[in-house]
């Protein structure tokens, strides 16, 4: 049975030819189905170190595939040392889920802007002497 999936995988930062591995992994995903949307986000920093690495090549694919193709993808990704992490979401069962690689990029920029605003907020500094005089008045 063919279902819709959103697949994200991260490749090792030291990998010389990412296109070859991306083509291999996308080929496995498209067996018995088709790739609807594919986007390479490039080399991005990790929030925390993974296997003593600080960066990785992010790739997002929206695909209609069989469960066998997804299982084969996960098996190959676990074996290949150049694949750092994978995430597979079955989006067919999630209500009101909008699948778009572009949408996920815009959501991240909004999130980063909100975090920046929160980070820059500081309470005004009041010296102890000034605070004591305000309380006495």
Curated annotation (Swiss-Prot):
SUPFAM superfamilies referenced in this protein's UniProt entry, alphabetically: Ribosomal protein S6
GO biological process: translation
Comp. bias regions, Basic and acidic residues: 126-137
Region (Disordered): 113-137
InterPro entries xrefs: Ribosomal_bS6 (IPR000529), Ribosomal_bS6_sf (IPR035980), Ribosomal_S6_plastid/chlpt (IPR020814), Transl_elong_EF1B/ribsomal_bS6 (IPR014717)
One annotated GO molecular function: small ribosomal subunit rRNA binding
Keywords: Ribonucleoprotein, Ribosomal protein, RNA-binding, rRNA-binding
GO cellular component, one term: ribosome
Pfam family, one: Ribosomal_S6
Similarity comment: Belongs to the bacterial ribosomal protein bS6 family.
Biological role: Binds together with bS18 to 16S ribosomal RNA.
Name this polypeptide is given: Small ribosomal subunit protein bS6
UniProt organism field: Mycoplasma capricolum subsp. capricolum (strain California kid / ATCC 27343 / NCTC 10154)
Lineage: Bacteria, Bacillati, Mycoplasmatota, Mollicutes, Mycoplasmataceae
């Amino acid at each position: 049975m063919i279902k819709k999936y959103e697949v994200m995988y991260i490749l090792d930062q030291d990998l010389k030819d990412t296109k070859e591995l991306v083509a291999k992994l996308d080929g496995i995903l498209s067996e018995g189905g088709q790739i609807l949307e594919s986007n390479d986000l490039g080399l991005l920093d990790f929030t925390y170190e993974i296997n003593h690495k600080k960066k990785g090549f992010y790739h997002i694919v929206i695909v209609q595939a069989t469960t066998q193709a997804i299982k084969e993808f996960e098996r190959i990704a676990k074996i290949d040392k150049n694949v750092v992490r994978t995430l597979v979401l079955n989006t067919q069962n999630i209500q009101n889920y909008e699948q778009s690689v572009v949408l996920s990029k815009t959501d991240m920029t909004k999130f980063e802007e909100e975090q920046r605003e929160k980070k820059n907020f500081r309470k005004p500094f009041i010296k102890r002497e000034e605070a004591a005089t305000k309380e006495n008045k």
